[in-house]
């Protein structure tokens, strides 16, 4: 009787331990999903911001070109604004990549990755 009782107690403890581990993993996954959603939202805002930066840099570049034609801006000014526009475009591309990574991570965590052939 005592051997069986001990085995039952041991199995009960193992079952409880497994339940706790499952609960911990579930909470950990839920936390990762929340973090991934927040990361995706942050990167989405960054894409929006960098889009606005490109528009601004484009406007400044066009104004500088016009000023150069009128003789009020130098070639150096044009090159500087051209460089600023290119930097804004590069920053935008990096932001898009970061967004896609965050979106993929969220899909991975939630099991929403579809493989279309």
Walk through the language-model features, giving the residues of each.
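Canonical tetratricopeptide repeat
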Residues: 36-37, 75, 96, 103
């Amino acid at each position: 009787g005592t051997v069986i009782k001990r085995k039952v107690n041991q199995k009960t403890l193992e079952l409880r331990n497994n339940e706790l581990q499952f609960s911990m993993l579930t909470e950990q996954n839920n936390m990762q999903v929340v973090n991934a959603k927040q990361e995706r939202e942050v990167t989405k805002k960054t894409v929006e911001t960098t889009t606005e930066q490109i528009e601004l840099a484009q406007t400044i570049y066009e104004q500088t070109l016009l000023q150069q034609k009128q003789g009020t801006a130098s070639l150096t000014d044009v090159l500087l604004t051209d460089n600023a526009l290119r930097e804004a475009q590069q920053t935008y591309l990096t932001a898009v990549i970061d967004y896609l990574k965050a979106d993929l991570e969220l899909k991975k965590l939630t099991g929403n990755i579809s493989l279309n052939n």
